[in-house]
């Protein structure tokens, strides 16, 4: 099978392996209130999804296609909730989540703390990187395009104190 053929080339770490190397996790849940412009964009997209998906009487093939379209719409809504630029490249404003993240990062820096930042969307990490670069925040970065040898070098660099943040895509960092 394809999975058996590619297994030697895929670097995956399980939580059990990684947890031994990490300090205890601190988890804080915060709510980010969308701006009016973000809320409008999200609501417009949600209504467009409902309009497209509200067809009645479908055969099995149409039902399968509808499931695929539903997942695509849900992904688009999740991306909009992260930052509208993930869906609309012309979006020039910030986002509520990015602003909240930047305020948290500032608090971390003031306390001389470091953090791991995970995202399922590499594009979202790219938006975050742009802001961090503007602010002069140092970081390590790892996504699926990072070669295996470079991944370990970046992990080692972060553990040695290089970078205030480590930005990691969930798929590349393991889930």
Name the predicted role of every residue range.
Residues 1-19, 26-27, 58:
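Conserved P-loop NTPase motor "coupling/switch" region that bridges the ATPase
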Residues 48-55:
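Cytochrome P450 catalytic domain signature, combining two hallmark sequence patches
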Residues 20-46, 58-175:
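Conserved Helicase C-terminal RecA-like lobe
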Residues 7-10, 50, 78, 129:
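Structural signal for well-ordered, non-membrane alpha-helices
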């Amino acid at each position: 099978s394809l999975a058996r053929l590619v297994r030697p080339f895929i670097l995956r770490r399980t939580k059990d392996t990684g947890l031994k190397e990490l300090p205890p996790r601190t988890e804080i849940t915060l709510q980010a209130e969308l701006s009016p412009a973000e809320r409008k964009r999200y609501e417009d997209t949600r209504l467009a999804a409902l309009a497209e998906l509200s067809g009645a009487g479908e055969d099995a093939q149409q039902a399968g296609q509808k499931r695929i379209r539903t997942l695509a719409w849900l992904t688009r809504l999740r991306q909009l909730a992260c930052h509208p630029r993930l869906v609309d490249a012309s979006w020039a404003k910030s986002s509520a989540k990015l602003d909240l993240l930047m305020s948290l990062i500032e608090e971390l820096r003031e306390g001389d703390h470091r953090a791991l930042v995970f995202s399922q969307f590499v594009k979202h990490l790219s938006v975050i990187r742009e802001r961090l670069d503007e602010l002069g925040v140092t970081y390590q970065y790892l996504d699926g395009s990072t070669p295996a040898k470079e991944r370990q070098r970046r992990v080692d660099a972060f553990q040695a104190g290089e970078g205030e943040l480590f930005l990691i895509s969930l798929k590349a960092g393991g889930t």
